[in-house]
Amino acid sequence: MSPLRIGTRGSALATTQTSHVAEALTARSGLAHELVVIRTEGDVTTGSLASLGGTGVFASALRAAVLDGVVDAAVHSLKDLPAAQPETLEIAAVPARADLRDALCARDGLTLATLPEGARVGTGSPRRVAQLKALRPDLELVDIRGNVQTRLARVPGLEQHDDHAPAAVGSPRGDLDAVILACAGLDRLGLDHVITERIDPEVMVPAPGQGALAMEIRAEDESFLGRALLDPEAPVGRLHAALELVDDRDTHVAVTAERALLRRLEAGCAAPIGAVARVGDGEAGAPRIEMTAMVAALDGSRVLRRTSSVQLDPVPADVVGDPAAADEWLEDTLFVAAEALGVHVAEQFVAEGADLLPGTVRGVDRGDGAPRPDDPA
């Protein structure tokens, strides 16, 4: 029986997080796997990400590998995926979310509140830039890119000596007071010790999908899936069954709401937009989905925030006695409610004039007219 081929980018972070997911998949399903490294344009370019012109720069090569049958599934950082999902592909599994917060990595243990006036802070994310300008307009923000080690090397005392993922040769060293990365990526790489502050989402709203991974496969036609159900040992049948075992429904529902917001605003993953949704207990034992979202002008001059929620109805009496039917009803209802919540919050932003803010929707103008993919770290 051939192993499942799992596609991944070649960076240390990508291979580490893909390995974690693939190992969990094997542990739960008993199916062997192999990692297939796919080089993406975002990995090999030496220029600014803006020069690549478009969102999804880290996903396109992986998606092509799935469609061409080079791999059975691809693992993405979900926040790097464009909000519009192609009809030829489906997100079949979203494992449990890691820490979704942004991480300040600063010299001398400094925090966002204790950084001195004029401190130089590096980030490649328009979302982080906009919120930092609103929170600390006295800071000097520096556009950066590169792998995690390259970014950390720009902060005195935080250079990581890793032969497998060294800092880029010739990149600046020690010229910044701090950088902002994602907690999830640092935790997955075992670099949590460089984090001087895990920034509260109420202070800095994370990117939609931050901390979550997506396992994407081909969206097969109904007749093909029907054959898979009839023959669970067929490759596609084994794949679907295995992915169901690593999918975390609450995380999948939450990111569905966050991505629905992006789609309704026609915004790319680079726009200065944040959103975080959670599934919790509501009334009468039924779930409740809550989402906090932020849309900002790129210069931080205006920041719009909204918190909204949707309460699900209890499971109907006609299915409550059938656990399988009740679970199917609940799952369908959760995803429909999540999609509606994301659209609702987006429409509230539009009513407040979010579509008039510079650099919020339909891509981000970085001065050369090219949209800028969000910070991959």
Curated annotation (Swiss-Prot):
The keyword Electron transport belongs to this UniProt entry's keyword annotation: no
GO biological process: protoporphyrinogen IX biosynthetic process
GO annotation, cellular component aspect: cytoplasm
Superkingdom of this protein's organism: Bacteria
Keyword Transferase found: yes
Cofactor list: dipyrromethane
Function summary: Tetrapolymerization of the monopyrrole PBG into the hydroxymethylbilane pre-uroporphyrinogen in several discrete steps.
Protein name: Porphobilinogen deaminase
Annotated source species: Micrococcus luteus (strain ATCC 4698 / DSM 20030 / JCM 1464 / CCM 169 / CCUG 5858 / IAM 1056 / NBRC 3333 / NCIMB 9278 / NCTC 2665 / VKM Ac-2230) (Micrococcus lysodeikticus)
Lineage: Bacteria, Bacillati, Actinomycetota, Actinomycetes, Micrococcales
